[in-house]
Design a protein with these regions (language model features):
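Catalytic-site neighborhood detector that most strongly recognizes the C-terminal catalytic loop/helix
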Residues: 2-13, 25, 48, 93, ...
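N-terminal non-cleavable signal-anchor helices
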Residues: 96, 100, 112, 148-149
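Short hydrophobic short-linear motifs embedded
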Residues: 37, 145-153
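Short, basic (Lys/Arg/His-rich) helix/loop patches that form interaction surfaces
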Residues: 12, 18, 26-50, 58-102, ...
């Protein structure tokens, strides 16, 4: 599956196609079962006066604050820290730093960013598949999961 993030929804103004690994698709489908058959994976619970059918930007931080209140020994973190966690996991998995940055839709700076227009879709797909395997193993509590770095392709 592919999730298309249009330019008007991305922080850097660049559209991106994000390859979704099978576990991510399964997690999204599981979330959708709670949506009462709406078009949204995360619908609004109440329409109220704002008249938008999906959750507000503040919903996840509010939910996270409730979870954090139950975990006083865990250092403070924000929703944005999940991106840092993803980037850290990709590094631990041996994903090329350039590919990992593109997984986060970060712009490449300097001359490299000007001349290199490759979207790295296949490389991002492989990286995100490996990350999904790690997350699935962690979700299942498998202590036997072994992180095996991706081998770099010869150019």
């Amino acid at each position: 599956a592919i999730w298309h993030l249009p330019e008007e929804r991305s922080k850097n103004g660049d559209a991106i196609d994000i390859p979704l690994p099978p576990p991510a698709v399964a997690w999204l489908r599981e979330l959708h079962t709670f949506s009462c058959n709406t078009a949204w994976v995360l619908p609004a619970r109440k329409m109220q006066s704002r008249m938008i059918p999906h959750i507000q930007e503040s919903t996840l931080p509010v939910a996270l604050a409730k979870v954090r209140a139950e975990m006083p020994d865990v250092p403070n973190f924000t929703i944005h820290d999940f991106r840092r966690t993803a980037r850290t996991h990709l590094a631990a998995l041996g994903v090329d730093p350039f590919v990992a940055e593109r997984c986060l839709n970060h712009k490449v700076k300097g001359v490299e960013g000007i001349y290199n227009r490759h979207d790295y879709f296949d490389e991002r797909k492989a990286a995100l598949n490996e990350w999904a395997k790690l997350l699935k193993a962690l979700e299942e509590g498998r202590p036997d999961y072994n992180v095996v770095p991706l081998k770099k392709k010869a150019l």
